[in-house]
Amino acid sequence: MNPSEMQRKAPPRRRRHCNRAPLTHKMNKMVTSEEEMKLPSTKKAEPLTWAQLKKLTQLATKCLENTKVTQTPESMLLAALMIVSMVSAGVTNSSKETATIENGP
């Protein structure tokens, strides 16, 4: 190889993108009002009682113990969210505790 062939060639230049304003324009046209975002199936829920919150904490603790996960604030939050999502999705569980949190104390 001669020295001119050994020189490294510059990579081809990237093409510049055209103005991305049309995408921004589409985003501005999106519906952003809260009333228009609500689905007809949105339901009002009663606030949690302290008893329900205590039961949720107990279920989350038991879930972490069963899975042998260290009990940290982060893992407790994730366990509680898992339980709430299972109850709201209607996942059937043989545990009476899940039914208690679903129906109240």
From Swiss-Prot:
Gene Ontology CC terms, in alphabetical order: cytoplasm; nucleolus
Transcription found in the keyword field: no
Annotated stretches, region: Disordered: 1-43
Keywords attached to this entry: Cytoplasm, ERV, mRNA transport, Nucleus, RNA-binding, Transport, Transposable element
Residues forming coiled coils: none
Additional note from the record: Despite functional similarity, Rec shares almost no sequence homology with HIV-1 Rev and HTLV-1 Rex. This Rec protein is encoded by a human specific provirus.
Record carries keyword Nucleus: yes
Biased composition (Basic residues): 10-19
Molecular function per GO: RNA binding
Role this protein plays: Retroviral replication requires the nuclear export and translation of unspliced, singly-spliced and multiply-spliced derivatives of the initial genomic transcript. Rec interacts with a highly structured RNA element (RcRE) present in the viral 3'LTR and recruits the cellular nuclear export machinery. This permits export to the cytoplasm of unspliced genomic or incompletely spliced subgenomic viral transcripts.
Domain of life of the native organism: Eukaryota
Protein name: Endogenous retrovirus group K member 104 Rec protein
Compartment(s) where it occurs, according to its Swiss-Prot or TrEMBL record: Cytoplasm; Nucleus, Nucleolus
Assembly: Forms homodimers, homotrimers, and homotetramers via a C-terminal domain. Associates with XPO1 and with ZNF145.
Motif (Nuclear localization signal): 13-20
A UniProt-annotated Pfam family: HERV-K_REC
Intervals of motif Nuclear export signal: 50-59
A biological process from GO: mRNA transport
